[in-house]
Amino acid sequence: EQQAKLIYDYWFTQFDFPDENGKPYCSSGGKMVWNEQLKRNIPENWNVVPLLKLVSWESNSQPPKSEFVYEPKEGYVRFIQNRDYDSDTHITYIPRTKNLSIVDRFDILMDKYGDAGAVRYGIEGAFNVALGKICVHNPNYREYIRSFLGSDGIYKFLHNSCMASTRASLSEANLAILNIVVPNEKIILDYENFLHKIRVSILKNKDETVELINLRDWLLPMLMNGQATIAD
């Protein structure tokens, strides 16, 4: 994750993305123009638009707890809760219905309460009411939008604006305040391809870690009670 943040900062905060010669754009004298909305210089021919021109916000309903089951079951789907991003100890499943919004592992979710504004991904299923989905209209923009929302400045802004409200909840109204720089199509595609490979690697490493933990938890009791031994 730190590597992804550094690349975003380099490309879209410092504007030192690779130019047509493979050199850092801004540091190599690439033309910058003043943008009145952002009160700063941005690369020539880049635009600034409201974030909600590129994304929409989606929420889910909360099923009754009586429908929860705690083992995989046909016709059921993983129920994603905020705590699942920190621990796998409370995995829950709910009936799959046509009214549920289902996300894949690369879709963007955000915390609405608690750590409001935190960006989440990596679990497939139906998300609960404490999370909101960021629906990116153009799939080629997904990694750029994820990085934008996950940047320190945007997270702090969204979190603080939620805490200042009477309901202390992230909503589409918070996102409506944000403007975002729109790079040219080549930069967007290059960034999407580059970052997607990093996300795949991150999820693969997480999966391997979970497998090792499960193996340890299965093997350790047998070693302790003598059901299994380690050969010399």
State where each predicted segment sits:
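Non-catalytic DNA-recognition/assembly elements of restriction-modification systems
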Residues: 1-7, 29-62, 185-231
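Short amphipathic alpha-helical segments
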Residues: 38, 130-132, 174-178, 198
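A short beta-sheet element
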Residues: 81, 99-155, 159-173
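Short coil/turn segments at secondary-structure boundaries
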Residues: 22-23, 64-72, 159-162
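Glycine-rich, mobile lid/loop segments that gate access to catalytic sites or pores
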Residues: 3-4, 8-15, 22-29
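Acidic, glycine-rich low-complexity/disordered segments
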Residues: 15-18, 46
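Extended non-membrane alpha-helical scaffolds
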Residues: 47, 71-72, 112, 138, ...
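Sequence-specific dsDNA recognition surfaces
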Residues: 32-38, 52-69, 75-107, 127-135
